[in-house]
Amino acid sequence: MKHLHRFFSSDASGGIILIIAAVLAMIMANSGATSGWYHDFLETPVQLRVGTLEINKNMLLWINDALMAVFFLLVGLEVKRELMQGSLASLRQAAFPVIAAIGGMIVPALLYLAFNYADPITREGWAIPAATDIAFALGVLALLGSRVPLALKIFLMALAIIDDLGAIIIIALFYTNDLSMASLGVAAVAIAVLVVLNLCGVRRTGVYILVGVVLWTAVLKSGVHATLAGVIVGFFIPLKEKHGRSPAKRLEHVLHPWVAYLILPLFAFANAGVSLQGVTLEGLTSILPLGIIAGLLIGKPLGISLFCWLALRLKLAHLPEGTTYQQIMAVGILCGIGFTMSIFIASLAFGSVDPELINWAKLGILVGSISSAVIGYSWLRVRLRPSV
């Protein structure tokens, strides 16, 4: 029990469980004995009916639309905390990770488009390599233990949070279906209620969650991706402490183990089951997977390193204390671990087009993410001396 407690207390535990879930999905999707069960599980219909309201989706969509909204609620809480009290609270603190994140989104997207611009269908996946899996990246960094400078961990977390915020904006602007104005109206009313609750100093988290459920349902029915409701709710839950208690921090503390050990692993299990049947080297080097691999493995570190170098040269920002530019470059490689976030965007980009495209996109994401994890970890292991 002591070893189990130590495992779940470590920063690396969430990343390790994600890896196990993804590997299990790959095995089950490619085994004759389990592939049928795996796909049947994902296609299991689940219906929710409240009065005249009816939501009917399969298990995969419930995981992607409902459970991932909880993940984005946690992201919203983390972004708010960092903006108001943490590593993004001042312009001087925020400048370096913000500039790094911008480079880490622009260059991978451009590199992907260099491969896919001529194809109007695969071109829609331009945002896939722009994402970073914060849990996976921090998990890999945690494997290096105490030799990692605290400032480097904070830099990676801040960069990944800004990256997540960028991904949220991209999803809202570019990956929406036909809009229902009536549902958007209900969503607007729900947001107005959240504003009033916050301004009136309401500190009961349950009230915000209840309004959040209404908001999630309205956003789901509107055509905008429902997970955005989670971020919005997270932004309005009060962060300020009163009598030593902060509703936002308390909810963040409660949600973190559920997200790290259930929601993200379940998402990985549901989405990483890529069938390798018919996969050839020729297929793997086709424009879609190759663009994703290049974006994650080359575009991410190149964009982050280049923009950081420019920021330093132009004196727009400074290196985090106790870190080196080579360590920043290695962190840039770790940010090429797109995994769950990239898979999520791929499902939005190609979900209504062709399941085969999603399969090839997932394969590119897995190759690019695993390569980034191995190379980034190896580089940092060489660059960082064990603490004595």
UniProtKB/Swiss-Prot annotation:
GO terms for biological process: regulation of pH. GO terms for molecular function: sodium:proton antiporter activity. It catalyses: Na(+)(in) + 2 H(+)(out) = Na(+)(out) + 2 H(+)(in). Keywords: Antiport, Cell inner membrane, Cell membrane, Ion transport, Membrane, Sodium, Sodium transport, Transmembrane, Transmembrane helix, Transport. It is a multi-pass membrane protein. Residues 32-58, 117-122, 177-180, 223, 273-286, 351-357 are periplasmic. Residues 1-11, 81-96, 131-154, 201-204, 237-253, 311-339, 381-388 are cytoplasmic. It comes from the Bacteria. InterPro entries: Na/H_antiporter_dom_sf (IPR023171), NhaA (IPR004670). The keyword Transport applies. It is found in: Cell inner membrane. NCBIfam families: NhaA, PRK09560.1, PRK09561.1. This is Na(+)/H(+) antiporter NhaA. It comes from Escherichia coli O1:K1 / APEC. The lineage of its organism: Bacteria, Pseudomonadati, Pseudomonadota, Gammaproteobacteria, Enterobacterales. The gene is nhaA.
